[in-house]
Amino acid sequence: MGGRAIVTDTNIFSGLESNTTGVTAFSMPAWQLALWATAYLGLVLVAVTGNATVIWIILAHERMRTVTNYFIINLALADLCMAAFNATFNFVYASHNIWYFGRAFCYFQNLFPITAMFVSIYSMTAIAADRYMAIVHPFQPRLSAPITKATIAGIWLVALALASPQCFYSTITVDQGATKCVVAWPNDNGGKMLLLYHLVVFVLVYFLPLVVMFVAYSVIGLTLWKRAVPRHQAHGANLRHLHAKKKFVKAMVLVVLTFAICWLPYHLYFILGSFQKDIYYRKFIQQVYLALFWLAMSSTMYNPIIYCCLNHRFRSGFRLAFRCCPWVTPTEEDRLELTRTPSLSRRVNRCHTKETLFMTADMTHSEATNGQVGSPQDVEPAAP
């Protein structure tokens, strides 16, 4: 998170600089700075382009505008904002240890990018909850469009509330002629306020959402993988739909695992640093921080790649979006995949599915000769 990195880096780095002249203890050779700049630039370009394309694919094609995909839009928007604002400006600050962007942007940097990170994990949690209801409880009412929009708005409001303390206590200081953007916690004896904030953020924005998603996807997986297909339908549409649901769940589990792996070292960096403050005085800590921050920010660029690799509709959308590239050749099937509506027979089949699922809920596999398998909610779960 932008503010957290700024606070720790600047407060520690400032103390070191007060005993140095000219070049700071955290300066790095030009070639090293160029390598880091290239790594961060590549990350930002891939993340912004990929997430903007995901948003376009969903908004530009009516067939893709579904409850789960609106949460995916929210996730993509949050990741795009994190890459554009947090990764870019925090890298400049961490590599130079000077705040170039003014007081107003100091407040902004300690609010909006942090909010976006919170929105990202909460959007993934909302997707897990939506899939849980659709697959485990298929006969329960699904979220309506107004409720979905209200949920997304609520996610942003909660995220803003969690990020606001850092923004409120943000300030500009000047140390040895260098401008700093720091968070001055009131009466923070021994850094207890900072440690408490890091622990609260870790629990509310990392640990608890991951526990909720782990439970949700575990139940979803058990429900899908134990679901049997009647023998006479083993090669029909129901089997394809069941496989599509499984593929979507695998994709979202991969998204969650990627987020968890990318962000865990970054959270631990700040929590452990609250107990061992002397580690921030080691010269190698700047390189450690830049590596951990890049790993955390890289989570913003993986999701579009996962969607493209594991979902045929998003793959078609990416081909259409990049059709101007000479090595990309979209087909008519790609266009139809995003624009055609389900056939009458498929819609009738979905209605029949709901009826027969209800009638055969307690039947064994051998008895369900007229049953339909799969949730009646989403024929193509990858574009639910």
UniProtKB/Swiss-Prot annotation:
One record GO biological process: positive regulation of flagellated sperm motility
Main localisation: membrane
PROSITE patterns: G_PROTEIN_RECEP_F1_1, G_PROTEIN_RECEP_F1_2
Keywords: Cell membrane, Disulfide bond, G-protein coupled receptor, Glycoprotein, Lipoprotein, Membrane, Palmitate, Receptor, Transducer, Transmembrane, Transmembrane helix
This protein's name: Substance-K receptor
Cystine pairs: 106-181
Similarity comment: family membership: Belongs to the G-protein coupled receptor 1 family.
UniProt-listed Gene3D superfamilies: Rhodopsin 7-helix transmembrane proteins
Chain segments annotated as transmembrane: 33-56, 70-90, 108-129, 150-170, 197-218, 252-272, 291-310
Subcellular location: Cell membrane
Function, as annotated: This is a receptor for the tachykinin neuropeptide substance K (neurokinin A). It is associated with G proteins that activate a phosphatidylinositol-calcium second messenger system. The rank order of affinity of this receptor to tachykinins is: substance K > neuromedin-K > substance P.
CDD domains (UniProt xref): 7tmA_SKR_NK2R
Gene coding for it: TACR2
Topology feature Extracellular, residues: 1-32, 91-107, 171-196, 273-290
Lipid anchor positions (S-palmitoyl cysteine): 324
The keyword Transmembrane helix belongs to this UniProt entry's keyword annotation: yes
One Pfam family of this chain: 7tm_1
